[in-house]
A protein has these predicted regions:
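Domain-scale signature associated with acetyltransferase and cell-envelope carbohydrate enzymes
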Residues: 1-97
């Protein structure tokens, strides 16, 4: 059976905030523990219900994730200045294959 995904806790999320990642509602954002500080760029805005999973995932600087709806980044990269939003849930998955 696959192990459940482990997410950063509030104290760990604070390190992303200190680095310049903008998370207005940290209790609603999930970042997998395999994601390290350098993998999410300064000035990136993570809207409520954003999820970042997969150890290969990264988000460059000045991105906006989860505009108008839930977005999941799964083993994928998001380029500098990208804006991801939706009218419903979106998953971006395995963009490196």
């Amino acid at each position: 059976m696959k192990e459940p995904i482990q997410y950063h806790n509030q104290e760990e999320l604070n390190k992303f905030l200190e680095k310049g990642v903008i998370i207005p509602e940290p209790q609603s954002v999930k970042i997998e523990r395999s994601i390290n500080l350098p993998q999410i760029g300064k000035g990136t805005f993570l809207h409520p219900f954003s999820r970042i999973e997969g150890e290969q995932s990264y988000i460059d600087e000045s991105c906006e994730i989860g505009i108008a709806g839930a977005v999941t980044i799964l083993n994928s990269g998001v380029g500098k200045g990208s804006r991801l939003g939706t009218l419903g849930p979106v998953t971006i998955k395995d963009t490196f294959t």
